């Protein structure tokens, strides 16, 4: 019974596993945006749904008293990747107000969620260009505002940091933890299987 099969495609590309799409099974796709090479699959898309990374619920940390404006780790400069242990990497975010992030192999990457999960606000300069069905439960509108003010009025952004951090953390807990993702997937499956 196809209703009992769920396929989760976590690949960093937007290409589909054609046989699974054509099988008609429920297909969760992380990098879900059109590719003209697979336009012939359009008729099979009724069971394809977006999915994203999530941060472990037990590891969510509001952060500490902020010691610096921007985290040392910066994906735009590989020389800043100096941490060998997860706790060192997370410590950098916990004590920073903001941290830069960007697409990695695909638009969705765990780094975005690690930043938020450690009480830090992602600075994602190109977030407004992300495809519509990628990172559907990510706070894109909120982080578009943050990116705008970081570029045009960083002093105002810093004066309103507590507000934006609270908004990011509220969103994170509601939509971007592993528990929230599991609940969302189960809800989607219950709607499809009616």
Feature annotation, model-predicted:
Residues 1-166, 170-193:
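Nucleotide-sugar donor-binding catalytic core of glycosyltransferases
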């Amino acid at each position: 019974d196809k209703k009992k099969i769920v396929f989760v495609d976590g690949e960093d590309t937007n290409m589909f596993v054609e046989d699974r799409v054509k099988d008609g099974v429920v297909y969760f796709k992380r990098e879900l945006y059109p590719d003209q090479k697979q336009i012939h699959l359009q008729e099979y898309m009724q069971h394809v749904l977006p999915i994203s990374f999530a941060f472990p619920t037990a590891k969510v940390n509001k952060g500490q008293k902020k010691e610096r404006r921007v985290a040392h780790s910066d994906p735009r400069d590989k020389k800043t990747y100096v941490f060998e242990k997860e706790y060192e990497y997370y410590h950098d975010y916990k004590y920073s107000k903001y941290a830069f992030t960007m697409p990695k192999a695909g638009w969705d990457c765990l780094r975005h969620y690690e930043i938020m999960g450690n009480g830090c606000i992602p600075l994602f300069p190109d977030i407004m260009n992300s495809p519509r069905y990628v990172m559907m439960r990510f706070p894109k509108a909120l982080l578009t505002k943050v990116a705008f003010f970081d570029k045009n009025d960083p002093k105002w952004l810093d004066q309103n940091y507590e507000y934006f951090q609270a908004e990011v953390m509220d969103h994170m807990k509601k939509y971007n933890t592993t528990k929230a993702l599991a609940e969302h997937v189960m809800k989607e499956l219950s709607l499809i299987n009616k």
